[in-house]
């Protein structure tokens, strides 16, 4: 069994019964179930959703995305062994902890397999909800060049790279290209202010202006829950991105929930606390892979400059990365997942066949 066989690189070709096109994202693919299958599963499994709620099967892959490109390695390694299972295990753990702490639900209704979530359709809030406790990365690069205002928040002079910020900062950006919002450029991933959101809450898909404060509370409280839990296993929660949406429960009540993934090495920076005390930054997140890419290629500007996307895409397409680089990511993700969850991440010999077998046998979704 080769390493390449243990990687689920293509996840949009499963024979799951659907009457809609499969949505294939950078890492996850979404299969919308038929009305009949959604209604049947809601009844059979007792999911706490409206009887006619649309359901989907969300399948994670082991692909690795960085700088908006998918990367691959030598020897046919088209992803990172264990990455998908590690990401899902971490998110599942945090979503459970959020519930225990009286925060909000997630869009996940069922977990048939380590790579698979059954989710209910949500109306997404069109904001990348970013929270930062330390100044690093793109924020530090901008600060070093003299910028002091971020998302309408004024930062003081004298901040130092990789040091804690005076307060937990919420620095939201747009999710997708939003058109016709005064003061908000029509481009993906543009920084926005709280005032932008308050003045145009409906355009960002908030149901009411009051929900802005609720999303901020869920963001701060969620950050706090994860930060405390990570501190208990010797890790620092540096910054992260959450996503939110609305769903309707079985009683017909609309509620704001967490969606996508939370507190993972893909969506967050996580540092080793002991190394940080000793003055070193050891990344237990995808940031380590980003740094590898910046050092590996002779012209890092290609990776940082949005005007050079065609060159960047060619770089990702035409270069096989060393196997060891992807295995280093594998070790990072599996180790941090096992620290967080307290359970072993078991690599599957044939994840695709396992998924097909379970969804056919226990859910009746394979034709």
From Swiss-Prot:
The keyword Nucleotide-binding is annotated on this UniProt entry: yes
Domain of life: Bacteria
Xref: SUPFAM superfamilies: SAICAR synthase-like
GO CC, alphabetical: cytoplasm
Biological process (GO), any one: 'de novo' IMP biosynthetic process
InterPro entries for the chain: SAICAR_synt/ADE2_N (IPR028923), SAICAR_synthase_Vibrio-typ (IPR014106), SAICAR_synthetase_CS (IPR018236)
UniProt-listed Enzyme Commission number(s): 6.3.2.6
Keywords: ATP-binding, Ligase, Nucleotide-binding, Purine biosynthesis
Database matches in Pfam families: SAICAR_synt (PF01259)
Pathway assignment: Purine metabolism; IMP biosynthesis via de novo pathway; 5-amino-1-(5-phospho-D-ribosyl)imidazole-4-carboxamide from 5-amino-1-(5-phospho-D-ribosyl)imidazole-4-carboxylate: step 1/2
Top enzyme class: ligase
Coiled-coil features, chain-numbered ranges: none
Family assignment from sequence similarity: Belongs to the SAICAR synthetase family.
HAMAP family: SAICAR_synth
Protein name: Phosphoribosylaminoimidazole-succinocarboxamide synthase
Species of origin: Vibrio vulnificus (strain YJ016)
């Amino acid at each position: 069994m080769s390493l390449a066989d243990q990687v689920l690189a293509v996840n949009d070709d499963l024979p799951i019964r659907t009457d809609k096109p499969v949505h294939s994202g950078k890492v996850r693919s979404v299969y919308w179930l038929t009305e009949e299958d959604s209604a049947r599963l809601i009844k059979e499994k007792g999911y706490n959703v409206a009887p006619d709620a649309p359901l989907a099967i969300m399948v994670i892959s082991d692909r690795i995305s960085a700088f908006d490109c998918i990367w691959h390695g030598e020897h046919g390694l088209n992803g990172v062994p264990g990455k998908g299972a590690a990401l899902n295990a971490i998110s599942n753990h945090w979503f459970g902890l959020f519930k225990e702490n009286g925060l909000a639900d997630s869009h996940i209704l069922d977990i048939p397999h380590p790579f698979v979530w059954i989710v209910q359709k949500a109306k997404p809030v069109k904001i990348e909800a970013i929270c930062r406790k330390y100044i690093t990365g793109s924020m530090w690069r901008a600060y070093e060049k003299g910028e002091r205002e971020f998302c309408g928040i004024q930062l003081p002079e004298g901040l130092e790279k990789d040091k804690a910020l005076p307060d937990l900062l919420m620095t939201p950006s747009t999710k997708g290209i939003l058109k016709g919002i005064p003061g908000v450029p029509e481009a993906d991933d543009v920084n926005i202010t709280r005032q932008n959101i308050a003045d145009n809450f409906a355009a960002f898909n908030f149901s009411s202006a009051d929900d802005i404060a609720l999303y901020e509370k869920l963001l701060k409280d969620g950050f706090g829950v994860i930060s405390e839990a990570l501190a208990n296993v010797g890790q620092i929660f540096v910054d992260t991105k959450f996503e939110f949406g609305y769903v309707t429960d079985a009683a017909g009540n609309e509620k704001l929930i967490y969606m996508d993934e939370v507190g993972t090495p893909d969506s967050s920076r996580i540092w080793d606390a002991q190394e940080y005390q000793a003055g070193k930054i050891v990344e237990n997140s995808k940031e380590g892979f980003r740094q590898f890419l910046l050092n590996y290629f002779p012209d890092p500007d290609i990776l940082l400059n949005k005007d050079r996307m065609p060159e960047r895409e060619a770089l990702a397409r035409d270069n096989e990365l060393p196997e060891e680089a992807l295995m280093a990511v594998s070790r990072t993700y599996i180790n941090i997942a096992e620290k967080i969850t307290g359970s072993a991440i078991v690599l599957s010999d044939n994840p695709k066949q396992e998924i097909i077998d379970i969804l056919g046998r226990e859910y009746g979704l394979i034709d």
